[in-house]
Amino acid sequence: MKKIEAIIKPFKLEEVKTGLAELGIEGMTVTEVKGFPAVIVEQPTSSGLGAPRFMPKLKLELVVRNDLLGSAIAAIKECARTDRKDDGKIFVQDLLEVIRIRTEERGEQAI
């Protein structure tokens, strides 16, 4: 099992959800986050000093079986891409265990 974290532009959420649903991946956690690009864009403040301009983003967290990893990554990349700076990032981690609290199912059965 793998955990995927994807940082995407908010207006791309529905498209990414649809792309993942076509693979049978429907459960995920979505969190509103803010970030700033590698090339920091400064915005004026009341003190006159520039401050990094944080951009609104969404962080998607989902767990997939190993056999769906490549397809899930491809769907996120295809659906979230705008070909502009700051389209986002995808992080993949090995997942040791998943436990569904209600049923106590473990592993892939708990996804």
Residue ranges and their predicted role:
Residues M1-I111:
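Positively charged, small/polar-rich N-terminal and surface patches that mediate targeting and assembly
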